[in-house]
């Protein structure tokens, strides 16, 4: 009989429920965990014991126990935490459970101890349950016991450790920045925290450590990282959280290639430790190439359905919508070919207009090329034979294809077709195997905010313009490019970064272009501008969305599945009831009252 191997001298168990194998047969073990299932077969009782590492089957036989063990087994119920002692033995060939890593063995239990009891759980603690997400979030501490959720947390822990080690091994210094800072809105609203000691003044929870990490570069840290909590009080979309985690990185005395190459090393190392190969150097795709080809600045390049420019074909078309766009400066006529969707029923195709409207379209023009060679479309009657022939050739049309069009401003047309491309890939269940990594670079420096009637920073107001575009910023801001790079993984923006402005005068000019008065710029960012005057070095950085990357690595549908205690889409914590009211006394302490 082998010796019991303690996994931790400060633990009640000697083995976990996920590690015992055939080679452990004959070993005495002590296990702890929760009763997952219990089956009474008359003279024998079987119990599946679960801990964070897995499940082991226990066998209770009155002839091989201390007398109380079998009696305890008769009373045990799901989710009771217990401690047992026993001997590992092999299961018979006919009783081996191939679904479990421990399926070749069981533990013949000679002693059992109930550590606590449990009320009946609101759902079964196992994978594949059909319980609503709200119920799972209400009882999140139970949901976390499920193997799938525990595996997600384990992967997140392992990946965080891997990227920390990869950074540490490359001389990056982990530095913590404050969670109570000055309110400097970066696009979303700040979560503000009233000061009790200074009535009427407020801290803000940081949307990112952006300004602080730039100050660390001024301070000489040179290579910084932090696994940082970030907070944004924005209108929540389906898969956004008011607080999230990013791996925040900054470097100084570097150019853009230095930063990107260092990041590739770090990311390739960290992903490699997770068993995911990330070939380096990564592809670099220009922003406009991504938009014009895929309709997205975060393209999934694992499948085709590329956007195709048809502007020249319809310059003289009798279909006025296309002809107008083809002859208007800055507008285009483009299309995608969804192969296989041409066989869809007319009613199903008509519903795609509603999908397109969510991406900004006022309607959706389409042509269905049926398998029998016929054509179904409300617009084809306006096309000449020459236009149809050119369309067929350029779109590589085959029977069964569905061609969908967008006509109008270039960027809007790209975004509409990019959204439809993604929708159709899901609807047609196009396979996307493996992981897809690339950089998207050279984003515009600004975009026009139609609501505010003002320029807005495409990334953030501290981004360095490309050297060749500095001179044109004031004359034509929308034509200026930026020293930016987004890390794209499987069609998601997994991270983003850029080079920073390290000159105080240029930073002030940038803020003025964004509508800041000099007084407002000094009020919000004066401390940064002052720091830049003290020999600020060239600097650039990056932030990796830890939640998003872990979602992709686990194959989860939502970032909520890789967070221990997430909020709902409305920002609520269903478990604790947050956000909640506070007492009048608490409000009085910080000189506030409810209106």
PLM feature spans:
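Class II aminoacyl-tRNA synthetase catalytic cores and aaRS-like
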Residues: 1-595
